[in-house]
Design a protein with these regions (language model features):
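Short, solvent-exposed loop/turn elements at beta->coil junctions and helix N-caps
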Residues: 15-21, 133
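Acidic-basic catalytic patches of nuclease active cores, encompassing PD-(D/E)XK
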Residues: 1-17
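Charged, often flexible domain-edge or linker segments that flank or initiate folded functional domains
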Residues: 25-26, 30-31, 35-45, 51-196
Length: 196
């Protein structure tokens, strides 16, 4: 997927970040000159919950991503859902699986090329009100808190001594003795988000 997307729009970089996947980060970051333009969350081919409607499916993750990431694609590698500021703008299918073989949809591929080019030309919106800023920052803080919480839980389960886990232990020892990973994650996320 990385090579395909980079070949469609010269000058962009598509980075897959598998080390952050367990923490809840989107699978791909699309950037130009190290500036993120958008994000892509990829699921398995023929995933039956690309819309994130099933509570036992992708719902919680997709809601979190749509509220925090302004320019987002959710895909199963054949179907691509384009979101702008949390709203589904359009969908396109570039192929189907028939008898275990992927059959390309040439019209869908042409449409996808145009849509992905537009996706890469995304310009962030100007914030014109304190309410809009507060909503955007809150969404980003929630996403960050979830990522930090998942990282802390992963470190604990795998008995890894990351700097984040060490900070959690120091926090417990010095400041709040009964703090839980989710609470520390919330404190960190708010400090990072609103401390900027």
């Amino acid at each position: 997927l990385e090579r395909l997307l980079e070949s469609l729009v010269p000058g962009i970089d598509v980075t897959n970040e598998p080390q952050r996947q367990s923490c809840g980060a989107p699978d791909y970051v699309v950037s130009r000159n190290v500036i993120p333009l958008g994000f892509i969350e990829a699921k398995n081919i023929n995933d039956d919950d690309l819309e994130g409607k099933k509570t036992t499916g992708n719902k919680e993750q997709f809601v979190r991503y749509r509220s925090a990431l302004n320019n987002l694609i959710i895909t199963d590698y054949l179907n691509f859902h384009f979101y702008d500021n949390g709203e589904l703008m359009t969908k396109v299918c570039i192929g189907t699986v028939e008898n275990g073989v992927i059959v390309p949809d040439n019209e869908g591929i042409k449409t996808f090329e145009l849509l992905f080019s537009e996706f890469c030309n995304y310009v962030g919106q100007t914030i014109k009100s304190p309410q809009k800023l507060a909503l955007m920052m809150a969404g980003k803080a929630k996403l960050l808190a979830n990522i930090i919480n998942n990282a802390l839980i992963s470190d604990e389960e795998n008995q890894q001594n990351s700097s984040l886990r060490e900070q959690m232990l120091a926090f417990k020892e010095i400041l709040i003795h009964d703090i839980k990973p989710a609470e520390l994650a919330d404190v960190y996320a708010q400090t990072i988000t609103y401390g900027l």
